[in-house]
């Protein structure tokens, strides 16, 4: 053995042998990480037809065919996706992940079955060793089609939009704490093709800034959960509406709470409610009278009005008007 180490040719090839050994070790760790990721995804309920890892050594890319996720109240599938984690560092440092959804999303919920097609859908994630730091989900030209099975007449739903963005973040790197997650939703130029009673042009812009329980990201809702809406901005034709408030999931399955609505253009709001068949002509006249009364007695005007929206005892109330059942979360 001493003769081997003293041989000149050994030291000539020693760097290459060392590099080969390190490459084999790195590939082994890369393969282990690939298997570990697949194991963790399977533990969450994700299945697939096939998974092909590639990208060694700089990154870890998984080409997934026919991924499918099955949970208690959710079934999701997609023809193909590509997930890339870079740099490849075994979770020792923060890593950036990118998921490219190559096909339409098929979603089954208790309320109905839906298909979401698009012209491009990327999700980016910043991952720490203890979980998700932040995530962005961007979709171009989304089209939602489906059927609401809980309704007796099984109405068809057909929505189209220009862009959809969903952004999630947490301020600290402690995933085991019950701290809520900050969520931002951006939707541009939504059009309601079905049902036609809602009007083709739904709104030009919808921005939501909210704080949600962390378990909501895992589709785990429970009674007592609190949703804090820091700001909701909606623009539709001549109507601009800004809302703030707090909502709570009631044990009976309804949403409870209150929102403060700041309305620009009361007439446009009444037009929207009447088009959606939520108010009658008589209700419209009552609201027009109250708007004029508020302008005369308070600081509001008919162009700018503050209106409370309450969800209480399973009903939805806009000021004095009963708009029907409160939203159900179950």
Language-model-detected regions and their locations in the chain:
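Short helix-loop boundary/capping segments
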Residues: 197-218, 237, 244-247, 251-253
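Gly/Pro-enriched, hydrophobic low-complexity segments
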Residues: 176-184, 191
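Extended amphipathic, helix-rich lipid-handling scaffolds
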Residues: 102, 119-147, 164-169, 185, ...
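Extended terminal
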Residues: 2-15, 52, 219-226, 232-234, ...
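Low-complexity, intrinsically disordered segments exposed to solvent
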Residues: 80-84, 91, 130, 207-214, ...
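N-terminal beta-strand/beta-hairpin edge segment
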Residues: 46-174, 232
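Flexible, membrane-facing loop/turn or short amphipathic-helix motifs
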Residues: 66-76, 103-116, 143-159, 170, ...
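N-terminal type II signal-anchor transmembrane helix
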Residues: 2-41
């Amino acid at each position: 053995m001493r003769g081997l180490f003293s041989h000149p040719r050994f030291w000539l090839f020693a760097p290459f042998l060392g590099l080969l050994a390190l490459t084999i070790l790195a590939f082994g760790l890369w393969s282990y990480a690939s298997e570990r990721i697949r194991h963790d995804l399977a533990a969450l309920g994700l299945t697939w037809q096939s998974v092909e890892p590639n990208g060694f050594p700089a990154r870890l890319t998984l080409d997934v065919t026919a991924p499918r996720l099955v949970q208690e109240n959710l079934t999701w599938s997609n023809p193909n996706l590509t997930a890339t984690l870079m740099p490849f560092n075994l979770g020792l440092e923060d890593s950036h992940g990118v998921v490219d959804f190559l096909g339409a999303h098929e979603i089954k919920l208790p309320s109905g079955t839906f298909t979401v097609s698009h012209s491009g859908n990327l999700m980016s994630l910043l991952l720490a060793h203890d979980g998700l730091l932040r995530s962005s989900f961007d979709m171009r030209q989304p089209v939602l089609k489906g059927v609401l099975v809980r309704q007796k007449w099984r109405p068809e739903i057909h929505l189209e939009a220009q862009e959809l963005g969903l952004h999630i973040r947490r301020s600290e790197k402690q995933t085991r704490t019950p701290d809520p997650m900050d969520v931002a939703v951006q939707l541009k130029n939504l059009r309601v093709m079905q049902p036609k009673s809602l009007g083709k042009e739904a709104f030009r812009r919808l921005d939501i800034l909210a704080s949600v329980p962390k378990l909501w990201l895992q589709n785990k809702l429970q009674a007592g959960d609190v949703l804090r809406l820091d700001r909701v901005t909606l623009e539709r034709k001549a109507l601009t509406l800004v809302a703030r408030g707090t909502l709570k999931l009631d044990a009976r399955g309804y949403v409870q709470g209150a929102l403060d609505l700041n309305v620009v253009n009361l007439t446009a709001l009444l037009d929207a409610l009447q088009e959606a068949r939520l108010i009658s002509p008589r209700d419209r006249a009552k609201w027009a009278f109250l708007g004029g009364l508020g302008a005369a007695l308070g600081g509001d005007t008919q162009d700018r009005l503050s209106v409370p929206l309450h969800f209480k005892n399973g009903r939805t109330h806009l000021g004095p008007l009963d708009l029907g059942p409160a939203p159900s979360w179950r």
